[in-house]
Amino acid sequence: MDLGRVVSRTGHEYSSAPHREIPVELRKLQDDVAYWVTHGTFPPDEIAVRFHHRLVLIHPFPSGNGRLSRLMGDLLAISLGQDPFTWGADSLKENGRQQYLDAVRAADKGDLKVLIALARVP
């Protein structure tokens, strides 16, 4: 994915798909998820978390991408016969938000283990 640069409200810089490539990247994501599900490439939770993470990276909207991506990840998990994720539950309200952002950044670097684990924290 050819990534653009965006600076968040908190001053953190992150990469996202350039605006003109968002539809293409969303289609690639749809195709990848269909392949993963059809071929059992990953366990259901990992498929849903990978989907969530890629959607965050694509960043299709000016704001609300994290919330939308978590909701979409939950819906995918449910469609795969899993319970919705907790995403750290109540901890997201306080210091857990930083844990979530750190887990997303680790996933940005290829380490999805922390984000997968956080998704199921009660």
Q: Residue ranges of each PLM-predicted region?
A:
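FIC/Doc superfamily catalytic core
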Residues: 1-122
